[in-house]
Amino acid sequence: MSRVCGLTGAHGYVGSALRRGLTAAGWTVVSLSRREKVAEDEIRWSLDEASGSGPNTLREELRRREISAVVHAAWDLRLVRPSDLQRVNVQGSLRLLEEARAAGVRRFVFISTISAFDEAESDYGKTKLAVERAVALQGGVVIRPGLVYGERPGGMFGALKTQAGRGAIIPLLGNGRYAQYLVHEDDLAAAVVAAVSLEKAPERPVTVAHPEPRPLRSLMRQLAESQGSHPRFVSVPWPLVYQGLKVTEALGLKLGFRSDSVIGLVRHNRHPDLNASLLGVAPRPFTDPGREQTQRNSG
């Protein structure tokens, strides 16, 4: 079996961590990129484009490069309308799944989210769940990461850390007790490395996160203190924040935090199936790596 892996979202925060992990484990990584000009180790591909026809279809590129596994981590977070989410993220993912199947790719790994569960209320969770079901039907591996963090975090965790270090008074959603399950980027990468090598996919999604939840207020306080800040948190009713963000989105304004993310935080899965052991991974407990780096530099 070739050890060549196609990876979508390789230039994003999570995708970059997965690429480092796969490369360190001896895999050759080919990025499926939406960039206009792609490098030699990339294939031009986008969620919002059909796979194409003619001599240069995606399936033919996957075959030509002898790609044996595809890890799908791309997701367009700029979209807010449910119809756009369905058209781009869901249908684009299903096209990729079909192209990989037609190309004879042995293992398909979908990076979903801990926000995907049967009772999910966020559009993010519901659309990820729709793709999960299609991947499972074709024998793929579904990984549901918790809130991903690392030394130089991006994504939701990065946004929370930036917010926590901004000032003496910080608004906090509701009572701040909303549980957050976290996973270090290296532990998530280890789970993906294990997944691409599996002979048989697990029969259910694999949730990769440390089993001890952190209340949002506690997490924000720790992130603030790691940046030398000791803010006062002011509780703001989450529906007020949600409606305010909906208005800004309707006006086309981008604030770095989406209304749907509010739903994901407050309507979280209270009882996630924390089964990372299915992939031989034991996620580490949370410590802020940025603070550890500062301590090492000053030591």
Which residue ranges define each predicted feature?
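N-terminal Rossmann NAD(P)H-binding glycine-rich loop of SDR-like oxidoreductase domains
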Residues: 5-25
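SDR active-site strand-loop-helix element
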Residues: 8, 32, 70-74, 108-114, ...
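NAD(P)H-binding glycine-rich loop region in Rossmannoid oxidoreductase-like domains
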Residues: 47-94, 99, 114-119
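Short alpha-helix in the Rossmann-fold core of NAD(P)-dependent oxidoreductases
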Residues: 86-93, 109, 128, 181
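Conserved beta-loop-beta element that borders a ligand/cofactor-binding pocket
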Residues: 103, 133-151
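Flexible, glycine-rich beta-alpha linker
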Residues: 119-122, 143-159, 178-179
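Substrate-positioning beta->alpha
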Residues: 154-159, 174-197, 203-207
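Mid/C-terminal beta-alpha module of Rossmann-like enzyme folds, strongest
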Residues: 194-255, 280-299
